[in-house]
Amino acid sequence: MSEFDGPIEEFPLVSVDRFDKENLNSTVYLLSHCHADHMVGLDALAFAERLKYKSLKLYCHRVSVALLKSLPLYNHLYPYLVPLDTDTPVTINVANEDGSVCYLMELTLIASGHCPGSVMFLLTSLNSSVLFTGDFRFDVGQAGRLKALQNFSKDAQLQIDNVYVDTTFCKESAEVIPKREDCLEVIFDAVKRWIEPAKDRKNVLFVNKTRYGYEFLMKALAEKFNCKIHVSDQQYSLYKYLPSIQQFMTLEADSTKIHFCKFKPGADNNLQIPCQHSLGFYPDVLKIIPTAMFFTKAESSPNSLVKAVIEKTIRCCYSTHSSTHEVVDLLSSINFKKLTPFVRPDRETSIDSVRSLLFEKLKAYKPELVQTENNKPSENIKEGLWSKPLSFKRTGRGCKRRLSSEKEAKEVEKLQNDEFNKDKNLNAEVERSLETEVERSPVDLSMAL
């Protein structure tokens, strides 16, 4: 569960994944993905009015735009959404409250592997750089191959000032979580053993509480067993602007043996499956709970990927968040100055202890890395090329520049003049194409996941 407050310290007037309280003073908003803990305040009237009356924008991946457009709670935000693609840097004018340009920011989206549309944000300016991971799941070695982070790789000269990192499973008991591919094989085997006798009454129900996020699993099941996956009406309508996802789903309960449909509030407790009345018979149902949290607890067996709960109900290991080792692998592949975890793996663990754990693990990769009281690198770490001071100072609800030299001031002024019209044209073009892009262009699911 994300505990991030929203403002990016190094980039004044920019807020990520939080849209209430002090974030209503920002002028640039970023959404990493459409899970509730990253959308606090997004449905509030105050935020909608902020966007409308100040002509502000919310930037996110185009898959997230399609999802927000399909949700009644958020579709009123559609005119203010700017759809972006991964690995395509865009320049954004970060404005003061009065609309004047405060500074220029380059934004790059990086696919994060958590769910459809989920991305990391790489923010850079003349003097600052930040990586906000959002929720992510990377394999070991994957981070080192990311084009967007090459300038900050361990062999490069530049450093990221702050890494805001997903630490959902950063604890000793979650040092390693099996790859999704390995977990899929276990799930495939469980499903096959249950439905292969080809008895009509045999059905499998996957139990999960999230609105979305298991599309990769559903797609894999559909391809493996050459069938569509039954979902509820509400789930199906969520993907009406994403045909590449909707194509492996069905509303016909009796046309498949694999179900992701959900029980409605107040449903009959005697039902074995939400769609039981539509099946026309009393089904024999195996319930599968895809989960990682259970398998990271001390009492679970580290060598088991499946665990029986009660009769005809099993838990299967499946994670959409990175393990401790995978998080450390990401951090070890880049140069950074400061580390800001934004998730506590459990109630007993503090953010400070999570940070300490990661620094301890990182010493194996970077012996020179020393955690100081201020979470800054030790003196023997080389400074990045962007280490020259160019600070921002808030004045009322805006900010002003303090430039380290007259030459730098002129350089910034020239950049602002050159880029301002370019950025205005970019935003206008994005807005004009938004209506047709989401509806006409099927989303490549492999890219989004």
Regions found by a protein language model. Name each.
Residues 1-24, 28, 37-200, 208-211:
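His/Asp/Glu-rich metal-coordinating catalytic cores
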Residues 13, 202, 283-285:
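Short, surface-exposed beta-edge/turn micro-motifs
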Residues 15, 81-83, 229, 285-287, ...:
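Conserved beta-strand scaffold positions in the cores of enzyme catalytic domains, especially
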Residues 33:
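Conserved G/P- and acidic residue-centered "switch" motifs that form tight phosphate/ATP-binding loops
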Residues 61, 232, 291:
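Residue-level signal for threonine
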Residues 140-239, 299-376, 381:
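Cap/insert and terminal regions of metallo-dependent hydrolase folds
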Residues 239, 243-449:
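C-terminal regulatory/interaction regions
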